[in-house]
Curated annotation (Swiss-Prot):
Domain EamA: 35-161
SUPFAM superfamilies reported for this sequence: Multidrug resistance efflux transporter EmrE (SSF103481)
Source organism per UniProt: Haemophilus influenzae (strain ATCC 51907 / DSM 11121 / KW20 / Rd)
GO cellular-component term (any): plasma membrane
Pfam families noted in UniProt: EamA
Organism superkingdom: Bacteria
Bilayer topology: Multi-pass membrane protein
Record-linked PANTHER family: EAMA DOMAIN-CONTAINING PROTEIN (PTHR32322:SF2), INNER MEMBRANE TRANSPORTER (PTHR32322)
Protein name as it appears in the record: Uncharacterized transporter HI_0976.1
Main location: membrane
Family, as annotated: Belongs to the EamA transporter family.
UniProt keyword Transmembrane present: yes
Length: 170
């Protein structure tokens, strides 16, 4: 159900322009990332149970850096970094927020949340992307985007609350 909600959300676009403005290749890349994520989620949880969160985070950051370095070298168009307050804040955000803090929070979540729940929460990523675009960038929601958000929320709530309700009734 959440997958249908994401599809409706993507199809909505700005002013209901829809799928014409969306790259099919980009959507396939996101779908591939989701499939890979689902495939390694349980394995990652088992690894984190055997090693410390700090060790796992360190290895993840180093391996992530090594595997993305060739793409960075090939795809970077401009190597100029503005050494002003905005440029330095951007570098700090990328170094701390998107790297270290993101991995640390992810590993803390893996230690405390069941793999099934974390898999469901991944469906909320596009929803938060849209909400941040609306609140921070002043984007507007189309009807189909709002419908997609509603379906994603209902699927997420249903998959997390329904097992608890069924467990109480038994």
């Amino acid at each position: 159900m959440a997958f249908i909600g994401v599809a409706i959300l993507i199809n909505g676009g700005k002013n209901n322009e829809g799928i014409d403005n969306i790259s099919l290749f980009g959507c396939l890349l996101v779908l591939s990332a989701g499939i890979i994520f689902a495939a390694v989620l349980r394995w990652t949880q088992r690894v984190v149970a055997k090693v410390s969160t700090q060790a796992y985070t360190s290895v993840s950051i180093v391996l992530g850096t090594i595997t993305t370095l060739p793409f960075t070298l090939l795809l970077t168009e401009n190597w100029q970094i503005s050494l002003n307050s905005t440029g330095i804040a951007g570098l700090l955000y990328l170094a701390i927020g998107c790297s270290w803090l993101a991995y640390w929070l992810w590993n803390k979540g893996l230690n405390s949340v069941d793999a099934n729940i974390s898999g469901v929460l991944v469906a909320l990523e596009p929803l938060f992307g849209i909400l941040f675009a609306v609140s921070l960038l002043g984007e507007t929601l189309s009807f189909s985007a709002a419908l997609g958000i509603t379906i994603i929320m209902l699927a997420t709530l249903g998959s997390t609350l329904l097992p608890k309700l069924l467990k109480k009734s038994v």
